[in-house]
Amino acid sequence: VNTRDICTNHKKSFLELKRIYFSKMKGLALVVGSGGIGTQIATDLSKSEKELDVVLCGRKSQFNSFWELDIEDSQSLLQFKSKISNHSSELRLVINSTGRLHSETLKPEKRLQHLDKKNMMESFSINAFSPILLAKAIEEFIPKNSDFNFASISARVGSIGDNQTGGWYSYRAAKSAQNQFFKSLSIEWARRFPKATITLLHPGTVDTDLSRPFHKFVPEHKLFSTEKSSQFLINIIKNQSPASTGKFIAWDSSEIPW
């Protein structure tokens, strides 16, 4: 008997069970962030997970089931909570796909002298503070007796152990802060909500507005379409469980050092 084959088949069976379970998950799924990745994830989930009521949440979208939400605005979050409370389905899945690398005024810093406090605060607001405050907003709706998944898109550049090139001070630090927030939260929720799972995700470099100014530095085979990135991320979320909560995982399912 080949023990390697037994182990491999057992692992495959476990993953298949996870996929089957996820496909039977019933309830409300919220995808927060109506940019390229978020919209694609919401689209793919609504097609593949027929028992989930998928709602895309963000500032604007033509998605068929959409809630307006400014994740950086406390009043908007209160209205968001009211919509969850009034919804008939149990909350089962939240995916945060918000993030900002650049804007008209915000640019990733190449060296120390480029640092600006206002820009640093903007980066931390959307990339660190808002995701954890989103978790705070939805916490009261986490089911006690059903599995619940919260996934947040981070970035490999937020890894301190993986930082080999420097630069991008604010974005790196903000994503590192997000990672620390959710690592701590995964420990708290493991005690309070044993069926909850938190996953931090690195989607790779995706062909969206966030990364578009930097595409020339990315090899063609490492620049993913939103469709491919969505498939990677959904498959990762499907295969997580409370036993693996608090992990920082790349698009290829490899674990990233903190």
Predicted segment positions?
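Conserved Rossmann-fold cofactor-binding substructure of NAD(P)-dependent oxidoreductases
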Residues: 72-87
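Rossmann-fold scaffold of SDR-type NAD(P)-dependent oxidoreductases
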Residues: 32, 91-106, 152, 199
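Catalytic loop of short-chain dehydrogenase/reductase
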Residues: 104, 109-119, 147-183, 187-191
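Rossmann-fold cofactor-recognition segment
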Residues: 63-75
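Canonical Rossmann dinucleotide-binding motif of NAD(H)/NADP(H)-dependent dehydrogenases/reductases
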Residues: 25-51
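A hydrophobic alpha-helix adjacent to the NAD(P)-binding/active-site core of NAD(P)-dependent oxidoreductases
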Residues: 66, 112-115, 123-124
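C-terminal helical subdomain
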Residues: 208, 212-258
